[in-house]
Amino acid sequence: MKYNNHDKIRDFIIIEAYMFRFKKKVKPEVDMTIKEFILLTYLFHQQENTLPFKKIVSDLCYKQSDLVQHIKVLVKHSYISKVRSKIDERNTYISISEEQREKIAERVTLFDQIIKQFNLADQSESQMIPKDSKEFLNLMMYTMYFKNIIKKHLTLSFVEFTILAIITSQNKNIVLLKDLIETIHHKYPQTVRALNNLKKQGYLIKERSTEDERKILIHMDDAQQDHAEQLLAQVNQLLADKDHLHLVFE
């Protein structure tokens, strides 16, 4: 399937598809979550012995509750230490000793190797894919920021938005459900739920083919097409604004 000329949106859909394939392949093979790898990458490249927890929350787009849980795991395995400020106990800091930094460096090197090996096997031709852990971190945060933009300005999930982008890119605006599932790189139940939500809100039409009832068609009428194009243009403009760019490391 070809996407339309909304370049920024197309880039993010490509990145999201890459991340989906990466997580699916790598997750069963490593003894650490991707988020924990990313957190260690962040701490390693900060090159600070002590970091306020508030700064980590500000820099990374993860939920604070998620970060708390992952930090607990890293503390448990002695990658980092957690200390409270003597001045104000409400302020928490992450502390890293030289020994811990060496241990973190080994994990970051492993993450670099995992990314390179996956890229070699994946054979993606996109220039957007990350070459190492630092680029992976930036792209992950950028895509999460993108999802926040969609949720805030359009009140749509990323899956719902991706479906709209794919359908509007088709010449006749007709997509088979089977083809959509193969293209979107999200789990089947999640995709079907998003489709049903879009149909309920009047964004698209979902119906069985009159020629073959086993086939489910997804398409839009002219008004729905115009509305979707306006939404895509709005998001593309937001993404084109460099003030909205969220990169942890330049």
Swiss-Prot record:
Tagged with keyword Metal-binding: no
Main localization category: cytoplasm
Alphabetical list of Gene3D superfamilies matching this protein: Winged helix-like DNA-binding domain superfamily/Winged helix DNA-binding domain
NCBIfam families: Staph_reg_Sar (TIGR01889)
Name of the protein this chain belongs to: HTH-type transcriptional regulator SarS
One of the GO BP terms on file: regulation of DNA-templated transcription
Family stated for the protein in its record: Belongs to the SarA family.
A matching Pfam family: Staph_reg_Sar_Rot
Inducing or repressing factors: Expressed at the early exponential growth phase, decreases through exponential phase and reaches a steady-state level at post-exponential phase. Repressed by MgrA and SarA. Activated by Rot and SarT. Transcription is also dependent on SigA and SigB factors. Is activated by SigB in strains harboring an intact sigB operon (rsbU, rsbV, rsbW, and sigB).
Keyword Repressor part of the UniProt annotation: yes
Other comment: Mutational analysis of the spa promoter suggests that SarS might stimulate spa transcription by competing with SarA. The regulatory events observed in strain NCTC 8325 are not representative of the events that occur in clinical isolates of S.aureus.
Keyword terms: Activator, Cytoplasm, DNA-binding, Repeat, Repressor, Transcription, Transcription regulation, Virulence
Organism: Staphylococcus aureus (strain NCTC 8325 / PS 47)
A GO molecular-function descriptor: DNA binding
Protein origin, superkingdom: Bacteria
Role description: Transcriptional regulator that controls expression of some virulence factors in a cell density-dependent manner. Acts as an activator of the gene encoding protein A (spa). Negatively regulates the expression of alpha-hemolysin (hla).
Subcellular locations according to the entry: Cytoplasm
DNA-binding region, residue intervals: 53-76, 177-200
InterPro entries, sorted: HTH_MarR-typ, MarR/SlyA-like, SarA/Rot_dom, Transc_reg_Sar_Rot_HTH, WH-like_DNA-bd_sf, WH_DNA-bd_sf
